[in-house]
């Protein structure tokens, strides 16, 4: 079992892809007090601590006990996917690369035009693969 590669993948997601793209896209919902966005953020943090617990038990024990009142080290099974109703979430498993590409393209376009990241920008089409995220991406990038 190659624990190094698994740990690096979790680290790459939790310190790079998740905050830089998924969390950035949800930021306005979090600021507005959206309970679903808040729950999802906590669920991801809690599950990430659980995944890291075999590798860094003292760190994950302290954080999970402080935040959630239960040590991630005591968890004996990897967390199950929790969705309400018959929601199909499998489509979200394959769009991270499209999300990263779209965000990078918008950020580069704004930088090349000397605009701040909060500046409005127009004539941008959200790719069809990201249509479920169009509202969040429009808000995130100030697309008019």
Positions of PLM-derived features:
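Feature 926 captures the class I aminoacyl-tRNA synthetase adenylation module centered on the KMSKS loop
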Residues: 1-144
């Amino acid at each position: 079992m190659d624990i190094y590669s698994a740990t690096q993948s979790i680290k790459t997601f939790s310190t790079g892809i998740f905050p830089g793209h998924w969390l950035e896209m949800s930021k306005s919902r979090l600021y507005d007090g959206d309970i679903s966005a808040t729950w999802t953020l906590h669920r991801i943090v809690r599950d990430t601590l659980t995944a890291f617990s075999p590798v860094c038990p003292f760190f994950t024990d302290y954080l999970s006990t402080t935040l959630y009142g239960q040590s991630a080290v005591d968890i004996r099974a990897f967390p199950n996917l929790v969705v309400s109703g018959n929601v199909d979430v499998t489509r979200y498993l394959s769009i991270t690369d499209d999300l990263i590409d779209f965000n990078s393209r918008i950020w580069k376009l704004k930088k090349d035009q000397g605009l701040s990241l909060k500046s409005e920008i127009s004539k941008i089409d959200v790719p069809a693969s990201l249509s479920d995220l169009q509202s969040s991406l429009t808000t995130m990038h100030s697309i008019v």
